[in-house]
Curated annotation (Swiss-Prot):
Entry annotated with the keyword Transferase: no
Function, in words: This is one of the proteins that bind and probably mediate the attachment of the 5S RNA into the large ribosomal subunit, where it forms part of the central protuberance.
Subunit structure as annotated in this protein's UniProt entry: Part of the 50S ribosomal subunit; part of the 5S rRNA/L5/L18/L25 subcomplex. Contacts the 5S and 23S rRNAs.
GO molecular function: 5S rRNA binding; structural constituent of ribosome
Entries under SUPFAM superfamilies matching the protein: Translational machinery components
Any one Pfam family match given in the protein's UniProt record, by short name: Ribosomal_L18p
Protein name per its UniProtKB record: Large ribosomal subunit protein uL18
Keywords carried by this UniProt record: Ribonucleoprotein, Ribosomal protein, RNA-binding, rRNA-binding
Classification via InterPro entries: Ribosomal_uL18_bac-type (IPR004389), Ribosomal_uL18_bac/euk (IPR005484)
């Protein structure tokens, strides 16, 4: 089993558990160059989103593929979710290790007011 398949299996296992809870989830996806975050309802509707691809976010950053960029995205997605009335979410790391950029995004979202 290769690295990508292992990650996807971990992601499916976690998503199944989150689905049983029936709560909104904060989904994170990372690539070497960018990081993306979405708050998704149990009915699969995107309630809030932010990424380093957005022009407004990109202007704030020196580089889009580092921990500082992840912190900025975490803060912005949390602010947008709270504006929509979402304060409690489940964290879906999409099978990525809770380390580095993924952990930085989660910490920034918590500091901005999301609870998980």
């Amino acid at each position: 089993m290769d690295k990508k398949t292992s990650r996807l299996r971990r992601a499916l296992r976690a998503r199944k558990k989150i689905q049983e809870l029936g709560v909104n989830r904060l989904v994170v996806h990372r690539t070497p160059r960018h990081i993306y975050a979405q708050v998704i309802s149990p009915e699969a509707q995107v309630l809030a989103a932010a990424s380093t691809v957005e022009k407004t976010v990109k202007e704030l950053l020196k580089s889009t593929g580092n921990v500082d960029a992840a912190k900025a995205v975490g803060k912005i997605v949390a602010e947008r979710a709270i504006e929509k009335g979402v304060a409690i979410v489940a964290f879906d790391r999409s099978g990525f290790k809770y380390h580095g950029r993924v952990a930085a995004l989660a910490d920034a979202a918590r500091e901005a007011g999301l609870k998980f």
